[in-house]
Amino acid sequence: MLIIAGLGNPGPKYAGNRHNIGFMAVDAIQRRQGFSAWSRKFKSEVSEGEIDGERVLLMKPQTFMNLSGEALGDAMRFYKLAPKDIVVIYDELDLPAGKARIKTGGGHGGHNGIKSIDAHCGKEYRRLRLGIGHPGVKDLVHAHVLGDFAKADQAWLSLLLEAIADNAAMLVKGEDSQLMNKIALATGGKPETEKPVAVKKQAAQSHIHQARATAQPKKLPVTGPMADMLKKMFGPKGD
């Protein structure tokens, strides 16, 4: 079993906020994958279904962002799950709008919802971070996060959410690299490729070393005064 939790704040006042992109993502999965209607459990709205043969519980904690860990912790203990059985989807200020990154574990990066989940569930769960961009000035962060997506954002936002919903099986199976490529292609970015292994260059040699390495032994003279002198010193060759 896997829990996929999207983070956000409950109520219509916050529904269109950038901070609620996690809610939007699990809503998209619920619609696309034909999950059950939303119901209330674990201080959350929950929806159940199967993806690629795996039982999945979608969650939208209704505790407000800063207490998200309470809801997720209740569900984790009820189903006797480990942190590795949890995926959390949430907004990321430090990623450009429309970009996505996924990893297991790490710090909370100042995100209060993640800070709460770390405290209640441990840190070794998978984190799908969805970029909402940074306003550029620290004083504007609060208004940016709790502000609604602009009309200009709707194009990339729809593509991002659709890509997550369409490729939810990759999320469930842990095919993280493939998922990132699918999202990048769907949103007009370039697929991520493995960096080529750098070929180690041979250390530069001094001109003296190079000369020694390439120098060929000189042939001894077989005729003439020098040859006669060598024969007297060492005897004729072949004796």
From Swiss-Prot:
Record-annotated site: Discriminates between blocked and unblocked aminoacyl-tRNA: N9
Keyword Flavoprotein carried by entry: no
Catalytic reaction(s) noted: an N-acyl-L-alpha-aminoacyl-tRNA + H2O = an N-acyl-L-amino acid + a tRNA + H(+)
One annotated GO biological process: protein quality control for misfolded or incompletely synthesized proteins
Binding residues annotated for tRNA, in chain numbering: Y14, F64, N66, N112
Family per similarity comment: Belongs to the PTH family.
Function: Hydrolyzes ribosome-free peptidyl-tRNAs (with 1 or more amino acids incorporated), which drop off the ribosome during protein synthesis, or as a result of ribosome stalling. Catalyzes the release of premature peptidyl moieties from peptidyl-tRNA molecules trapped in stalled 50S ribosomal subunits, and thus maintains levels of free tRNAs and 50S ribosomes.
Name of the protein in its database record: Peptidyl-tRNA hydrolase
Organism field: Rhizobium meliloti (strain 1021) (Ensifer meliloti)
Gene designation: pth
